[in-house]
């Protein structure tokens, strides 16, 4: 498999403003065409209107970044932190500071310094465990080196294993070390069974620690570590959205023993300044969305512009990715619209016709479509061609044929699922997953991401030479399964075709609980593959920025679908809290 070729195709409160809630009395709507005296009974998912409407988004104002003094402080603090980072001595002290910078969300200011420090530590790898045999230090070194693409073996933890093959009993009370060990275990790759066993061991002991702590009053110096353990058990840092984690950690960091006040103050100011930038971007994107007028014609689709923008913040929040966020927000909204048309509203005849028109990619065929589909096709056609123009202008390559093809592939899988629903077909688990990795929309998302993000695109990197690139397939598997775990029960209740959980149950006679455990295991295995790609990022011909963004997409997916359908029904999950903390609620200064 050629590592540099990507396969994207079929081979593969703050005063939150709530609109008045609308209620839909039934699950089907009637549609009579003016041309034919035929009445179609169309389904409806009863999606609620947006929680944040256009006027509310336009009213956003971040009071913490208006003062010139705040911006001046940010510049001063930024350089003071840089000076501290460059002057700090001792490997463990350097690792601790890098970890704090990352968790506080300000490490993007010091990418070169961090890389140089980690490269030197990697060149001297093994000194920490040889000198200290400290579980926390060894684990943190392992985490940061793998996180930044340096090669380090799981054998680094062998020094903590007794002659009986188990972790030494003296580690039982080393909660700080066990927490770092637990976090390190999530960087496992395929066949690294020792790390997988380590995860089970650390999880068990940390869970016992939380249970024991609930029976007593924690000392002040234990509060920080207890909160960190609870957070990790809920979501390991490696699987968490970086911006969301930074917002949480800023509040927790001040409880840490020997915390650095300079880092804390700079992190708070920087978070608010970035949040203000994101709010301005969201206003512009909301204005674009409002100007399309689509929601006046397509009242059956999910109006989720804020949620879609939140996805892009999870993928890359840094200022230099403003254009990428704009493009991806548009792609997410296009996917949502088309998914709802295929999944809920369109008739089979309409969907087959629409798929055919998209494959031809010719506006001369638009008159064959019903009116609502004409609008959708022209919207898709114009937006994708504009992206293609931007890439041609900036990078000299015509990507429109590739973009058109990946949308065609996506709609063909949507159509397949619609046929399954109409005919009552129950696919095998393998059949479902072969279709599902494409219908997940990940190949579509990643192709657009690669086109606008990479400076080294070519026909070769976009051509389907490798039938199943590991990055694309692994990310697609995670989104497909995470989405199914969160939404399949509700979708089955409204009569949808079987999802992965049900297909696995039918095929293996497993219980729903067993099937869900299997899906979680597949998600974990997919992360192992992604970890392998991240570990070899420095030698991969794929841009590291692309690999990191793909991993971040998985983090958003698992966050959005952890407690239910956080995109379609955010009010029923924690998505509302997540969005408010990242986009609307500044850090008090």
Swiss-Prot record:
GO terms for cellular component: chloroplast. It is found in: Plastid, Chloroplast. The keyword Plastid applies. It is an enzyme of class 4 (lyase). Pathway: Secondary metabolite biosynthesis; terpenoid biosynthesis. Keywords: Chloroplast, Lyase, Magnesium, Manganese, Metal-binding, Plastid, Transit peptide. Mg(2+) 3 binds at residues 483, 487, 491. A motif (DDXXD motif) lies at residues 339-343. Mg(2+) 1 binds at residues 339, 343. (2E,6E)-farnesyl diphosphate binds at residues 302, 339, 343, 480, 483. Residues 1-25 form a transit peptide. Expressed exclusively in flowers. Induction: By coronalon. Also induced in response to the caterpillar P.xylostella feeding. Binds 3 Mg(2+) or Mn(2+) ions per subunit. Predominantly involved in monoterpene (C10) biosynthesis. Using GPP as substrate, the major product is (E)-beta-ocimene with minor amounts of (Z)-beta-ocimene and myrcene. Using FPP as substrate, could also be able to synthesize in vitro sesquiterpenes (C15) with (E,E)-alpha-farnesene as the major product and with (Z,E)-alpha-farnesene and (E,E)-beta-farnesene as minor products. This is (E)-beta-ocimene synthase, chloroplastic. It comes from Arabidopsis thaliana. The lineage of its organism: Eukaryota, Viridiplantae, Streptophyta, Embryophyta, Tracheophyta.
């Amino acid at each position: 498999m050629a590592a540099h070729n990507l396969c994207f195709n079929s081979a593969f409160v703050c005063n939150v403003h709530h609109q008045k809630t609308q209620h839909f009395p039934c699950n089907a709507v009637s549609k009579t065409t003016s041309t034919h005296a035929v009445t179609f009974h169309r389904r409806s998912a009863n999606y609620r209107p947006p929680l944040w409407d256009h006027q509310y988004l336009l009213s956003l104002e971040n009071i913490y970044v208006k003062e010139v003094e705040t911006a001046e402080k940010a510049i001063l603090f930024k350089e003071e932190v840089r000076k501290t980072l460059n002057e700090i001595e001792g490997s463990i002290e350097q690792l601790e500071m890098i970890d704090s910078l990352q968790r506080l969300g300000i490490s993007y200011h010091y990418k070169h310094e961090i890389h140089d420090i980690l490269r030197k530590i990697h060149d001297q790898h093994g000194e920490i465990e040889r000198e200290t045999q400290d579980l926390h230090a060894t684990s943190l070194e392992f985490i940061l080196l793998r996180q930044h693409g340096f090669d380090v073996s799981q054998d680094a933890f062998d020094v903590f294993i007794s002659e009986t093959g188990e972790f030494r009993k003296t580690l039982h009370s080393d909660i700080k070390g066990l927490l770092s060990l637990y976090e390190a275990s999530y960087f496992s790759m395929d066949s690294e069974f020792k790390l997988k066993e380590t995860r089970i061991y650390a999880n068990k002991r940390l869970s016992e620690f939380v249970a024991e702590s609930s029976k007593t009053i924690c000392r002040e110096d234990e509060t920080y570590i207890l909160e960190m353990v609870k957070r990790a058990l809920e979501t390991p840092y490696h699987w968490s959205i970086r911006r969301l984690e930074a917002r949480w950690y800023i509040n927790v960091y001040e409880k840490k023993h020997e915390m650095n006040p300079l880092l804390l103050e700079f992190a708070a100011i920087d978070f608010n300044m970035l949040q203000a930038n994101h709010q301005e971007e969201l206003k512009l994107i909301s204005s674009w969305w409002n100007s399309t007028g689509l929601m006046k014609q397509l009242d059956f689709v999910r109006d989720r512009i804020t949620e879609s923008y939140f996805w892009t913040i999870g993928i890359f929040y840094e200022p230099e990715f403003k254009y990428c966020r704009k493009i991806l927000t548009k792609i997410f909204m296009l996917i949502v619209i088309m998914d709802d048309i295929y999944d809920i509203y369109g008739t089979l005849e309409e969907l087959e016709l629409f798929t055919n028109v998209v494959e031809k990619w010719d506006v001369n065929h638009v008159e064959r479509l019903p009116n609502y589909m004409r609008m959708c096709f022209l919207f898709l056609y114009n937006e994708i061609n504009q992206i293609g123009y931007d890439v041609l202008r900036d990078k000299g390559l015509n990507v429109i044929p590739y973009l058109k093809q990946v949308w065609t592939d996506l709609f063909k899988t949507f159509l397949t699922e619609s046929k399954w629903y109409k005919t009552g077909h129950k696919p095998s688990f393998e059949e479902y997953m072969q279709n599902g990795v494409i219908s997940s929309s990940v190949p579509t998302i990643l192709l657009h991401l690669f086109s606008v993000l990479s400076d080294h695109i070519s026909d070769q990197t976009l051509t389907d030479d490798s039938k199943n690139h590991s990055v694309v397939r692994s990310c697609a598997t995670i989104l497909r399964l995470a989405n199914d775990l969160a939404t399949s029960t509700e979708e089955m209740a409204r009569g949808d075709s079987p999802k992965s959980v049900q297909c696995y149950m039918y095929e293996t006679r497993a219980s729903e609980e067993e099937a869900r455990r299997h899906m979680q295991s597949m998600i974990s295995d997919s992360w192992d593959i992604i970890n392998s790609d991240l570990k070899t990022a420095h030698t991969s011909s794929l841009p590291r920025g692309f690999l990191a963004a793909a991993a971040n997409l998985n983090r958003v997916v698992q966050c959005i679908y952890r407690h239910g359908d956080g995109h379609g029904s955010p009010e029923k999950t924690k998505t509302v809290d997540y969005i408010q903390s990242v986009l609307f609620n500044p850090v008090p200064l």
